Amino acid sequence: MDQAKLARLQQSVRIGKGKGTPRRKTKKVHKSSGTDDKKLQTSLKKLNVQPIQAIEEVNMFKEDGNVIHFAAPKVHASVPSNTFAIYGNGEDKELTELVPGILNQLGPDSLASLRKLAESYQSMQKGEGGEDAKKDDDDDDDEIPDLVEGENFESKVE
């Protein structure tokens, strides 16, 4: 072979240089919550759930003492399959935020946690009240002299 032919062949061979084949774009599938809701709806239809009307609020009590509170939710139920579906925006709230209107909904476990909360608040208030009382007493003591037998402080005050 001729050296000139070899040089031309070497230049024509592309290894790592040039564009080559274009990169293939993959189609990204975005999974939306709408598809999840549709799947949930179809599985609930299989259970033959019925909507329950006139429910003002739903409260779910957690073990840590907090409550998941749903205001004006949509509720569907299937009593034979013991399935309840609650739709709406749930908010995590502390038990103390809902206390006046929630007392009739509390079970024995929740009542125990409510008692614990009440006791902890009382102990905190007593601790703060005791410290405040001591501080107030110390402030008042600066103006009042200590009583010592045999001395008359009336002349010093005037």
Swiss-Prot record:
Gene Ontology terms: cellular component: cytoplasm; nucleus
SMART domains associated with the record: NAC
Residue ranges with Acidic residues bias: 137-152
Pfam families per the UniProt record, alphabetical: NAC
InterPro entries, per database record: BTF3, NAC_A/B_dom_sf, Nas_poly-pep-assoc_cplx_dom
Major subcellular location class: cytoplasm
Source species, domain of life: Eukaryota
Keyword Magnesium: no
Bias-annotated ranges (Basic residues): 16-31
Cell compartments where the protein resides: Cytoplasm; Nucleus
UniProt keyword list: Cytoplasm, Nucleus, Protein transport, Repressor, Transcription, Transcription regulation, Transport
Region listing for Disordered, in residue ranges: 1-40, 119-158
A GO biological process held by the record: protein transport
PROSITE patterns (UniProt xref): NAC_AB
Family as reported in the entry's similarity comment: Belongs to the NAC-beta family.
UniProt function note: Component of the nascent polypeptide-associated complex (NAC), a dynamic component of the ribosomal exit tunnel, protecting the emerging polypeptides from interaction with other cytoplasmic proteins to ensure appropriate nascent protein targeting. The NAC complex also promotes mitochondrial protein import by enhancing productive ribosome interactions with the outer mitochondrial membrane and blocks the inappropriate interaction of ribosomes translating non-secretory nascent polypeptides with translocation sites in the membrane of the endoplasmic reticulum.
Name of the molecule in the record: Nascent polypeptide-associated complex subunit beta
